[in-house]
């Protein structure tokens, strides 16, 4: 089968953890695939606002699957699909995270707003070279401008279980990137990168079988499983590798270029 759409995760895949931007070798390899006629989509837990200028060097993706599948965007920056949190979902998260003094942020079009503990987000972002356009939102009022379509928090897994005991009827999912990590995307039921791949494929007139997906984290597993060909990086989680059709090289120093 001739694959027509390549979806690439950023952090831990296109961008090794040691780099502030994707290696030039990876950028060149993706451009070559695009020049050969394959459409390129960036599939990331970041909102579109969190992919800063220069992070992808000179890449010009045809599509974006952002906020873990909640925001689909075209090459010009127009939303193709948007799955916003409801007021009930958002308020439940804020109440719970405030009760336990846990860091929480929401994704909007202009920035990621840290509603709780901006300082902790700022510290972790700098330590991991993420630069995800996070601003101090502790006034907790930006949802009055628009409702968020992405959410990320830091909490132990046992506290995620406690949230589900209290608010399980909401159907929210806590998608941790890696075993042992306390950072997780918090998604609506049915929203993930795999669903985003399928939704984008439909909008582009393609089938999921015509797509290749490359990722490394637990939050990539649905995408790797949904694609016609799923490739997990060697540095990826066990769940990502289990969901993929094959395992590629380590993201360091420029694993995508070595595929």
Predicted regions: what is each one?
Residues 2-19, 224:
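Asp-based phosphoryl-transfer active-site loop
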Residues 21-122:
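Active-site phosphate-binding/coordination module
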Residues 27, 31, 221-225, 241:
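Alpha-helical segments flanking ligand/cofactor-binding loops in enzyme cores
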Residues 41, 65, 212-214, 231, ...:
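Hydrophobic/aromatic beta-strand patches that form the interior of the parallel beta-sheet core
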Residues 59-60, 68, 170, 226-227, ...:
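Short, structured coil segments at secondary-structure junctions
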Residues 100-103, 107-214, 218-222, 226:
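Conserved acidic, metal-coordinating active-site core of Asp-based
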Residues 226, 231-259:
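Asp-based, Mg2+/Mn2+-dependent phosphohydrolase catalytic module
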């Amino acid at each position: 089968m001739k694959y027509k759409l390549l979806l690439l995760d950023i952090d831990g895949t296109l961008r090794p953890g040691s780099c502030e931007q994707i290696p030039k070798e990876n950028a060149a390899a993706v451009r070559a695939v695009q020049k050969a006629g394959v459409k390129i989509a960036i599939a990331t837990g970041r909102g579109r606002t969190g992919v800063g200028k220069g992070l992808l060097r000179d890449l010009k993706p045809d599509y974006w699957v952002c906020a873990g599948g909640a925001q689909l965007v075209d090459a010009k920056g127009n939303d193709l699909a948007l799955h916003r949190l409801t007021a009930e979902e958002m308020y439940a998260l804020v109440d719970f995270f405030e009760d336990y003094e846990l860091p929480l942020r929401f994704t909007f079009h202009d920035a990621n707003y840290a509603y709780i503990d901006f300082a902790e987000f700022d510290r972790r972002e700098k330590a991991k070279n993420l630069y995800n356009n996070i601003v101090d939102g502790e006034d907790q009022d930006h949802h009055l401008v628009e409702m968020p379509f992405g959410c990320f928090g830091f909490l132990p897994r046992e506290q995620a279980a406690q949230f589900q005991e209290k608010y399980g009827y909401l159907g929210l999912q806590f998608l941790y990137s890696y075993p042992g990590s306390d950072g997780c995307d918090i998604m609506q039921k049915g929203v993930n990168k795999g669903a985003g791949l399928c939704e984008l494929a439909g909008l582009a007139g393609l089938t999921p079988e015509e797509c290749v997906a490359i990722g490394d984290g637990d939050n990539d597993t649905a995408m790797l499983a949904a694609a016609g060909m799923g490739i997990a990086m060697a540095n990826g989680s066990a769940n990502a590798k289990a969901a993929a059709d094959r395992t590629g090289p380590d993201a360091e120093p420029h694993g995508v270029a070595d595929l």
